[in-house]
């Protein structure tokens, strides 16, 4: 039996309603439209069979499969809802308030039994940040951060704390996905000169100095983002500072760290300086993609050794999204960028399409792995609100624009469990569509009247880097570094220009056949025929190679000595001398 079509939930000033997914795009009868502007929150369960929403008066739960109302709770101010992984518990959160007489406020975090509708437990949760408890996928374990320590509950028994993880001041934690044994990553910020650190533990082994599976310390961290891979074998940590002391950025400084449950850890070396915009794991758990660097940003896929596998070059992007099956990757530039998307086949590293979703504030893959949702929502943008459904080949299949006096607040797909939709063969041909693709108008630069009839000279603010495969090629020669390759290209271009200039100056002379070029790393071969000149060329190349190594050390942050800096300053003169010798000047 073919899987049903995913639904689309739309919430805005026009009300709350559902739309059938591709290929129909008609309003669904599963959920009768609820008019008005009072709906503050709505959410599907993890498997998409339940739907809950709060309308300012009640929080309701319906069954999507039989269209029946299950429960209704009197929660006037609920603004956050979350289902547990197996639909056993519905968590609700309301803003915390205290009485005017100064007495403690009432509990504002409620956990309801979805089957019976009874309240299992109520807690006081003052902050909206990290308000929801974290469950394991089988719901045998649930965890909350309470007063800088993690409390663990077993089998949804919230009256008894089964275990505690207490360190100095736990700021954040992330429970691992997948089956047992469960693991937890905790972050403790640094204080009084001590570094910040992230530790990995296996539940319930928290006691003892060697209980941690892995530990990673770093000084430059005011906050962190921890990302488990799907198999719970490793965590990626984005460490951020609020202020960049080097003055290179207004938005602080970021570093990317890799921590494995076997104790291994590493700093992921990013070739381009600048902020880290996004990091995302592939569903295979064997590689991850990072988007980083000053604009135009770079995007690179790394393996579990933190070695680059494929570099997508530079472009206007700040986000990455893997498809549910992990075979397609979308690199996009949203927010203050124009909305250009690059859709890549990451098995063959081939570009599929480059659609543009202008002014988009939201992106989501459909659970079928074929369709994409982009939307422009308020309050991020209050004009041109609406949503589009694309095929990954770049075709717009459906488009909806809200009226000019209305707003769109939220659009979301109905989730499905993994394996419901099988992965399909990737196609590069755009699927047919009745909705025309709107080509964005390219703004032309102003040209004064005196220059309008003259040819346009194109000038670039930066050099764009093309995509390249970073896997080492077969052979014994060690690949050159990026800096060495760049200098090699510059040198070869200068050499060709000089040869061309010399041939222009002496047109009478008969052209002599150019000697066959030799690889840069085969310095032992005779170049000029003169042993003395060959010896000088060999020594110059040795010095230039040493300078390249010094520059690479400086790029990693190593402090160089004065004599080493003086060597680097001599690079231009050495290159010139080498050119003169090779050209026979």
Curated annotation (Swiss-Prot):
The modification N-acetylmethionine is found at residue 1. The gene is EIF2A. It comes from the Eukaryota. SUPFAM superfamilies: WD40 repeat-like (SSF50978). Residues 517-528 have a biased composition (Polar residues). Residues 434-534 are annotated as: Disordered. Functions in the early steps of protein synthesis of a small number of specific mRNAs. Acts by directing the binding of methionyl-tRNAi to 40S ribosomal subunits. In contrast to the eIF-2 complex, it binds methionyl-tRNAi to 40S subunits in a codon-dependent manner, whereas the eIF-2 complex binds methionyl-tRNAi to 40S subunits in a GTP-dependent manner. GO terms for molecular function: cadherin binding; mRNA binding; ribosome binding; translation initiation factor activity; tRNA binding. Residues 531-582 form a coiled coil. The keyword Acetylation applies. This is Eukaryotic translation initiation factor 2A. The modification N-acetylalanine is found at residue 2.
């Amino acid at each position: 039996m073919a899987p049903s079509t995913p639904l689309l939930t739309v919430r805005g000033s026009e009300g709350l309603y559902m739309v059938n997914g591709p290929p129909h795009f008609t309003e669904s009868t599963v959920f009768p439209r609820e008019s008005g502007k009072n709906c503050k929150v709505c959410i599907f369960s993890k498997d998409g069979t339940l739907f809950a929403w709060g309308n300012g008066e009640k929080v309701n739960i319906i069954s999507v499969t039989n269209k029946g109302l299950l429960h209704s709770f009197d929660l006037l101010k609920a603004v956050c809802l979350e289902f547990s992984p197996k639909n056993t518990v519905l968590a609700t959160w309301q803003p915390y308030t205290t009485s005017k007489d100064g007495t403690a406020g009432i509990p504002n975090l409620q956990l309801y039994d979805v089957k019976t509708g009874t309240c299992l437990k109520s807690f006081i949760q003052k902050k909206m940040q990290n308000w929801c408890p974290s469950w394991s996928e089988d719901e045998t374990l649930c965890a909350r951060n309470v007063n800088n320590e993690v409390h663990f509950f077993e089998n949804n028994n919230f009256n008894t704390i089964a275990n505690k993880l207490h360190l100095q001041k736990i700021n954040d934690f992330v429970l691992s996905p997948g089956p047992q044994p469960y693991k937890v990553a905790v972050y403790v910020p640094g204080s009084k000169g001590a570094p910040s650190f992230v530790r990995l533990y296996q539940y319930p082994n928290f006691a003892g100095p060697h209980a941690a599976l892995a530990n990673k310390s770093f000084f430059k961290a005011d906050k962190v983002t921890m990302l488990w891979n799907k198999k719970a074998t490793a965590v990626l940590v984005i460490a951020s500072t609020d202020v960049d002391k080097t003055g290179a950025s207004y938005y602080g400084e970021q570093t990317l760290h890799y921590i494995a449950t076997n104790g291994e850890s590493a700093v992921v070396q990013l070739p381009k300086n600048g902020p880290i915009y996004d990091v995302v794991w592939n569903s295979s758990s064997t590689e991850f993609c990072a988007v980083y660097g000053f604009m135009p940003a770079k995007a690179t896929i790394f393996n579990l050794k933190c070695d680059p596998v494929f570099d997508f070059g530079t472009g206007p992007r700040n986000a990455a999204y893997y498809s549910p099956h992990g075979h397609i990757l979308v690199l996009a530039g949203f927010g203050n960028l124009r909305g250009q998307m690059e859709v890549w086949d990451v098995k063959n590293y081939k570009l599929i399409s480059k659609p543009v979703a202008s002014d988009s504030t939201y992106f989501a893959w459909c659970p079928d792995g074929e369709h994409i949702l982009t939307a422009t929502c308020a309050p991020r943008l209050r004009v041109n609100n609406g949503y589009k459904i694309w095929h990954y080949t770049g075709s717009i299949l459906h488009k909806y624009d809200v009226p000019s006096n209305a707003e769109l607040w939220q659009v979301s797909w109905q989730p499905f469990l993994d394996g419901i939709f099988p992965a399909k063969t990737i196609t590069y041909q755009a699927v047919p569509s009745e909705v025309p693709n709107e080509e964005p108008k390219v703004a032309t630069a102003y040209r004064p009247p005196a220059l309008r009839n003259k040819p346009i000279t194109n000038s670039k603010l930066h050099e764009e880097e093309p995509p390249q495969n970073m896997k080492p090629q077969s052979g014994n020669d060690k690949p050159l570094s990026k800096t060495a390759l760049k200098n090699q290209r510059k040198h070869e271009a200068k050499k060709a220009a000089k040869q061309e200039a010399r041939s222009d100056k002496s047109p009478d002379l008969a052209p002599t056949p150019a000697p066959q070029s030799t690889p840069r790393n085969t310095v032992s071969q005779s170049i000029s025929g003169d042993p003395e000149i060959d010896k000088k060329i060999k020594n110059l190349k040795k010095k230039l190679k040493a300078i390249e190594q010094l520059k690479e050390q400086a790029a990693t942050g190593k402090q160089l000595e004065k004599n080493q800096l003086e060597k680097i300053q001599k690079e231009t003169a050495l290159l010139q001398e080498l050119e003169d010798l090779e050209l026979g000047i």
